[in-house]
Regions:
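N-terminal transmembrane-helix/juxtamembrane module of multi-pass inner/ER membrane proteins
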Residues: 1-55, 87-114, 253-272
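Hydrophobic alpha-helical transmembrane segments
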Residues: 48-67, 123-138
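Membrane-helix interfacial "entry" motifs
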Residues: 34-45, 58, 62, 66-70, ...
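Interfacial segments of alpha-helical transmembrane regions
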Residues: 60-84, 150-151
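Membrane-embedded catalytic cores of phosphoryl/pyrophosphoryl-handling enzymes
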Residues: 107-257
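Alpha-helical transmembrane spans of integral membrane proteins, capturing the lipid-embedded, hydrophobic core
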Residues: 3-4, 54, 74, 78-86, ...
Length: 272
């Protein structure tokens, strides 16, 4: 992935014309965009929301109740992901597809994005940040077909979610590749950061749990307001907001009572 990023950068800067970045992958983009248009637009508009950092953290907030270090790894990775995304977008300033292609050539779902901040895809970066942070904590050394199936399934799901950015007409294919690569780095950094804190099993208790419940409740309220202000109210936003509200309530009342589970998921023992 890093080789692809380097090659694209050299090619574009060598020509001295930022529009060449889109020209290199115009046919790829149009082919994929048209192929994905066969699925209902509402599916893609909801799937693409899962690349929103607030939505992803809210939907996965139940991890706080059972595997808090995994959720903490995602939260810890967020600043790295944000910094990588903002820096790269400003540095490359690549035009989005709708900025250089004729409107009749592409299928756009939602608003047509025309800014010069296409590279990398922030959604792809967020998706892979979350996935890699989770896998690095829960399955740091996959063993056995079950665990490898989880890894493969996670990567497949992440790939589909990334493709939603092409489906809605927001990103070029290489935006997704670079975003995924940077997200991989951010996810590993978040997981490494989470390992430096030893108090995860008790993070739901006492003042820490109550403070965390306030944060999660605030996230829930923000998402529910956003859903109400976005007709017709994307189900992904409502689901994320309600999930976070339920987790905030659980934290407030101290449920579940038992301590959090160990972060690493072990392979079931084989019968002798």
């Amino acid at each position: 992935m890093l080789i692809v990023l380097t090659a694209v950068t050299v090619e574009v800067l060598g020509h001295g014309d930022l529009s060449d970045y889109g020209a290199l992958q115009r046919d790829w983009f149009i082919t994929i965009n048209h192929a994905l248009a066969s699925a209902p637009g509402q599916i893609w508009s909801n799937l693409t929301l899962l690349g929103d950092g607030a939505v992803l953290l809210a939907l996965l907030s139940p991890l706080i109740l059972w595997r808090p270090q995994a959720w903490g790894a995602m939260l810890g990775a967020a600043p790295f992901a944000g910094a990588l995304s903002a820096t790269a977008k400003h540095w490359f300033a690549m035009p989005r597809p709708a900025a250089v292609l004729d409107p009749q050539q592409i299928n756009v779902i939602g608003d047509a994005l025309t800014a010069h901040n296409s590279l990398p895809s922030g959604h792809a970066l967020t998706i892979f940040t979350g996935l890699i942070a989770l896998l690095a904590v829960l399955l740091p050394r996959p063993a056995g077909w079950r665990q490898w199936s989880v890894v493969a399934g996670g990567l497949l799901l992440a790939g589909v979610l990334c493709l939603s950015r092409i489906a809605v007409g927001a990103h070029w294919p290489l935006d997704l590749v670079v975003g995924a690569a940077l997200g991989w780095v951010a996810g590993l950094l978040g997981a490494a950061l989470s390992r430096r804190y030893a108090g995860w099993p008790q993070v739901r208790r006492g003042i820490t749990g109550r403070c965390l419940s306030v944060v999660i409740l605030g996230l829930s309220i923000a998402l529910l307001i956003r859903a109400a202000d976005t007709p017709p109210g994307p189900p992904a936003l409502w689901l994320a907001g309600i999930t976070a509200a339920a987790v905030a309530f659980c934290l407030l009342v101290g449920w579940p009572r038992q301590p959090a589970q160990p972060s690493v998921i072990s392979e079931p023992a084989r019968p002798g």
